[in-house]
Amino acid sequence: MLKEGSSLDLSASSSSGTLRSDNSFGNSPLDRITSLLILIYKSIRACFKWIYSKSFGIICILFVILDVLTTVFFKRFIDHTKNYVMFTIQVIIFTFWIIVCCIAILCFLFNREYMKRHFNVRPLVFLGFLDMLSTGLSANGSAHTSGLMLVLLGQISVPLTMVSCKLILSKKYHHYQYISSAIILTFAVLKPILNRTDTTDNRFYNNMLYLLASVPDSIASALREKQYTSKFFHVVKYQFFGFLFHFFYNILYTLLFTLPFNSVKGYFDSLYKLCVNGYKCIFFGVNTITENCGPTLIPTCDNCLEAFKIYCLYILFSSAIRVAYVFIMLDGSVTFTLLLGTVKVPLTSIAFSLRFIAGDSTTSFNLLDVVCFLGIVAGLLLYALGSKKIQEETDLLESPLIDDAESEHELLSTGTEKLMRSEICHDLFT
């Protein structure tokens, strides 16, 4: 029997004291703050893990939103500078080229190994020519085409791109995808056919120019997918040389576009006025053409007051959508990107009805846009089902009929059976 004050009692009392001191430390303010910070860190880490797991879907949603904003602000920018469309396009291309140059310099300073990677520039020569045709036609067409009509006419790119990918890339499509393309086009055209109350400036000639721009754009999209899926793809060099060729080709297009004049002097005068007055319009908001002009006349009156602010916002949204486009192309396809962009048809209509977004380019919105939206979503779902069917058929063709282990076992059993039969026959005839 132990006495009081023995070593065991002392050790027990000391351990209980230690336990009490540990509990008191666990409830200290500093420990609570540490636990709170750890909890916040784990929550943020879990959120980032969830975002990373859903990154493709999030990028697709951002792509649609940015696509809507880019379309709206492009139309607003053209509306404010419609008398200087070709100079406006040159300013946009040159701005993006400067941004890519800055990115290239940073990559050269901090990631030289990436910049040393080989990249074939030759395909971009033809791509730049196609981009020049597409940009020039769409820019001149959009000058007198309403914002919503731009989006609806642009949906012809979906079947044209599918045809281009089939001819150039030999891509296979499921019949569901062809049906979905027809559904999307039907609901895209439903809006302008049934709703003729749009009072914005729409000229048939400009509508046709914008429609024709889809032909070179669809061919360029198919060739661009070939570039993106190449193992030698270099995103920085691709953007650098792409904008460079596009810029010089667009100068050629501008020179050809301003040719129909009576004299050489008039030709160079028109080029001078295009550049100087366009520069004043975009960067200083100066209206040059204010007399003998009107909405139904050629030229229209200048409206350059907010051109520079709209230009900055357009560059911001367009830069962001290019980044999202790269990520989607690396994990998807150009046809999926186009079909994803068709969701913007009703969403753009909503955006054009909101004055704080569309500004002077505001148009009316009605319930027909909801019908178009549901129809386009149905087409997208059918396209996704067709993509799944194609993927299942591809996996079925690529997978072996018999697993390696099973085939090896079957060969072994067959060989053993043949050996046993030969031994039996040998025993019978000897």
Swiss-Prot record:
Disulfide bonds join 281-304, 293-301. Residues 1-22 are annotated as: Disordered. The keyword Transferase does not apply. It is found in: Vacuole membrane. GO terms for molecular function: xenobiotic transmembrane transporter activity. Residues 75-88, 144-147, 195-206, 261-306, 359-364 are vacuolar. Glycans are attached at residue 195. Signal peptide: none annotated. InterPro entries: CRT-like, Transprt_Chloroquine. Belongs to the CRT-like transporter family. Nutrient transporter. Involved in maintaining the osmotic homeostasis of the digestive vacuole. This is Putative chloroquine resistance transporter.
